[in-house]
Amino acid sequence: MFIKRIGIDLGTTNTLVFIPGKGAVVFEPTIVAYDLNDNKVLAVGHEAKEMLGRTPNDIGAYRPLKDGVIADYKTTKAMLQYFISKTLGSFNIFKPIVIVSGPAGITSTERRAVINATLEAGAREAYLVREPILAALGAGIPINSASGHMIVNIGGGTAEVAVISLGGIVSWASLRIAGNKFDEAIAEYVKKKYNLAIGEQTAEKVKIEIGSAVNQKNKLECEVRGRDLDTGLPRSITMNSNEVAEAISGH
């Protein structure tokens, strides 16, 4: 299949690849695993996430983006190369036009870094569109109308609020408090209250399954398994949605 254009939602936590007419074809964690001895990429996405926090000293698993922008250029380029190659398949010899998302407050230098990394990763042409615009289009909002529309986009590294009118962003604000901070808050809450250590994947699972910003009358529950900090042995607890609300209340 000849793919002319692809869209990449390049997030701090997860990356999504979109093909017109087919929708989302790739949804994987924004993580790259490296062999530190020879600087070789070992895994990207789901496979690399499995290595996070479990790798030996000679293997490093990194998130190459921070707060929605490139923190490690070389690693980001390798990751983009993987996602583009996976999307196109081995039989597609043509370079696609790639549209990449970026934060509302991205600087010209940060924009250029994303475009250059995308071109070096295998794109024929690369363009960056700010995330609030893409979120509005995805939600079916008429961005070219004269009336204002407020978009709240909560990602892994940043949460952005933007007002859109006449096809552009009139005003915006960005907070470096988003999904990853919620995961950290949940893990810290479990550690303090239950003396139980849990990893970021477990904390994320709790957030997704029973996450709530406010107390609920009908509480949701889930089992949380971790390591007892006194004995070092595995132990399970039952956590509810109101506890999650309490854990993230400071954010």
List the model feature ranges, each with a label.
Residues 159:
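Acidic, divalent-metal-coordinating active-site segment for phosphoryl/phosphodiester hydrolysis
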Residues 1-154, 162-251:
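Nucleotide/phosphate-binding catalytic cleft detector across ATP-hydrolyzing
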